[in-house]
From Swiss-Prot:
Protein name: Ribose-5-phosphate isomerase A
Lineage, highest ranks first: Bacteria, Pseudomonadati, Pseudomonadota, Gammaproteobacteria, Enterobacterales
UniProt keyword list: Isomerase
Record InterPro entries: NagB/RpiA_transferase-like, Ribose5P_isomerase_typA_subgr, Ribose5P_isomerase_type_A
EC number(s) reported in the record: 5.3.1.6
Length: 219
């Protein structure tokens, strides 16, 4: 199977967690896009969705799914999203698509985080994929200096402005042995909006696309 076929398989497999009559949290990226396609087949059974990016919102609306503002929603049963890396502790690096802040906010509200990914995203140690950090523009250089002190090589993601109007620093060269400590440290740097480490709030279920089918891992 191609990588895209594996992504499609896990996107559709996540439908089993969608309860009729609920509002579903929806992520961003190529794997989440397959889940949105699948969710379109249930649009008459669900109340709607909360979306983590403008791109996902457009796709949801194009399929006739109502998109709610998170402020109008009391709780979410599930949040379904992909990952750039996921380790054995269900901790993830996310933010390759620059939607990390909204993704993290929605994940924090959901009862259950379902990560959908192909097997290439599974790692023993996080950090080979550059760690995205969303930063207030005026703080870019100051934050970069602090990230160097933490052992990383920050690189400004040229030409990218987040849906929140901020910029992204991608931090290379990290071997993340204590993801929770690093998440807390980076989030504590003035000017950082959030870091794409999902360790304090990791995944509850991972659906991993493999050549042998979809593998389910439960925390």
């Amino acid at each position: 199977m191609t990588q895209d076929e594996l992504k499609k398989a896990v996107g559709w497999a996540a439908l089993q967690y969608v309860q009729p009559g609920t509002i579903v949290g929806v992520g961003t990226g190529s794997t989440a896009a397959h889940f949105i396609d699948a969710l379109g087949t249930m649009k008459g059974q669900i109340e709607g969705a909360v979306s983590s990016s403008d791109a996902s919102t457009e796709k949801l609306k194009s399929l006739g799914i109502t998109v709610f503002d998170l402020n109008s929603v009391d709780r979410l049963g599930i949040y379904v999203d992909g990952a750039d890396e996921i380790n054995g502790h269900m901790q993830m690096i996310k933010g390759g698509g620059a939607a990390l802040t909204r993704e993290k906010i929605i994940a924090s509200v959901a009862d259950k985080f379902i990560c959908i990914a192909d097997a290439s995203k599974q790692v023993d140690i996080l950090g080979k994929f550059p760690l995205p950090v969303e930063v207030i523009p005026m703080a870019r250089s100051a934050v970069a200096r602090q990230l160097v002190k933490l052992g990383g090589r920050p690189e400004y993601r040229q030409g990218v402005v987040t849906d929140n109007g901020n910029v992204i620093l991608d931090v290379h060269g990290l071997e993340i042995l204590d993801a929770i400590a690093l998440e807390n440290a980076i989030n504590g740097i003035p000017g950082v909006v959030t870091v794409g480490l999902f360790a304090n709030r990791g995944a509850d279920v991972a659906l991993i696309g493999t050549a042998d089918g979809v593998k389910t891992i439960v925390k």
